[in-house]
């Protein structure tokens, strides 16, 4: 932790003795810089280019040292566009890694990768900054308490419950609902959550970032009248940013979250959308730095880069960071190196299925692919565990019977199997749920369902008490009482039509 009340910029530390170099080569977002003998900067040091281009426009580009090439030359990756830079321009070595503002002054504001506010609300009033590169907490500092984090989403709470202070991954291909699910989790958890939240937008759509900001202002998570009372800090490095910014914006968000955990001793929520873009940016940078690509063209340092980010997201005896990360799955292939490397670090995985999304079942969470280390009788209790296992067994049996149904039809199944299929189809629909953040699209009001209500609903379906109700009564409802009420309404409507 460093306090530098003298600097206006959060990036550059005090530069009494300037260590100056000159640009020798520019290849897109990568710069080669020559320094005087014996004055070489360290790896991860921030370099700043302050100059004017040919038409007199001010240039202010920050880079990060990635390689020491020899012959007094270093290779650095730019955190913003390199337009207007020329060979021979002066480069200042700041003598320290990128540092960003941390603490209460960051709440309610939007930052870029350098920790500069980008919301047009004036400068951030903070004197406390922290470097984005830090080591993970020591093993002895870690907290090992196990407790459930209730989300109000039926399929998550029942089949793959989240751990308080754990790491959670939302896996899915393009357009199956990762961002909507992460928005709903922000809505359900961040609003009811007493602590603070940090949202890292890594390489995703600018429009979604803007929507989230507006949504948070409307809901009061960001307090416009008194910004200091806000509960969230936003850090964006969107799709249009250079790979250097997308590669480091996750670390900027994490650094802000770590301060709340370690210094303020708070419980923090860290949302990252999307962790795949962090890997993708690392892959782009790796190729630009001339490293030999590894499997499927990814960087050879994939596991190391992922580990250095994920190991810092943890709970210590001071406070906790509960992290929810969206993970894009290229071509719906979960064995792709990027999602496969992420799996190893997570306590719970929520896998979104294109098949369910095509059926119109939202959230399209696959009940069989989603997993959680918390689903154990000693943690969640016997009743919850037994119900979850029976739901999974029924879903698995239905999946096995689908080929037979497709070829021979339902009538060729045994009585027992027909009953299993009917209950599985009801459960599949009951796992859907109207979301608060999707109200404007669906026209249905959002529903928050407590864990006890969720367990009761599935027990009633499994016991056979609701076998007489139609399937559509279970679609997009909250608790089981709404399903029975919907069934009665459907019955009345059908009688009126006759």
From Swiss-Prot:
**Mind listing the GO biological process terms from this record?**
proton motive force-driven mitochondrial ATP synthesis
Where along the chain is ATP bound? 172-179
State the SUPFAM superfamilies in the record: C-terminal domain of alpha and beta subunits of F1 ATP synthase (SSF47917), N-terminal domain of alpha and beta subunits of F1 ATP synthase (SSF50615), P-loop containing nucleoside triphosphate hydrolases (SSF52540)
Asked whether the UniProt record includes Kinase among its keywords, one would answer no
EC number in record: 7.1.2.2
Which GO cellular component terms, listed alphabetically, does the Swiss-Prot or TrEMBL entry include?
A: chloroplast thylakoid membrane; mitochondrion; proton-transporting ATP synthase complex
Q: What GO molecular function terms would the record report?
A: ATP binding; ATP hydrolysis activity; proton-transporting ATP synthase activity, rotational mechanism
Question: Where, per UniProt, does this protein localize?
Answer: Plastid, Chloroplast thylakoid membrane
Q: How does it sit in the membrane?
A: Peripheral membrane protein
Q: Which UniProt keywords apply?
A: ATP synthesis, ATP-binding, CF(1), Chloroplast, Hydrogen ion transport, Ion transport, Membrane, Nucleotide-binding, Plastid, Thylakoid, Translocase, Transport
| Keyword Electron transport listed | no
The region annotated as signal peptide is none
Which CDD domains does the UniProt record give? ATP-synt_F1_beta_C (cd18110), ATP-synt_F1_beta_N (cd18115), F1-ATPase_beta_CD (cd01133)
Per its record, the protein catalyses: ATP + H2O + 4 H(+)(in) = ADP + phosphate + 5 H(+)(out)
Name the enzyme group at the top EC level: translocase
PANTHER family associated with the record: ATP SYNTHASE, ATP SYNTHASE SUBUNIT BETA, MITOCHONDRIAL
What function is annotated for this protein? Produces ATP from ADP in the presence of a proton gradient across the membrane. The catalytic sites are hosted primarily by the beta subunits.
NCBIfam families, per this entry? atpD (TIGR01039)
Q: Which family does it belong to?
A: Belongs to the ATPase alpha/beta chains family.
Q: How does it assemble?
A: F-type ATPases have 2 components, CF(1) - the catalytic core - and CF(0) - the membrane proton channel. CF(1) has five subunits: alpha(3), beta(3), gamma(1), delta(1), epsilon(1). CF(0) has four main subunits: a(1), b(1), b'(1) and c(9-12).
The name this protein goes by in its record:
ATP synthase subunit beta, chloroplastic
Q: Which gene encodes it?
A: atpB
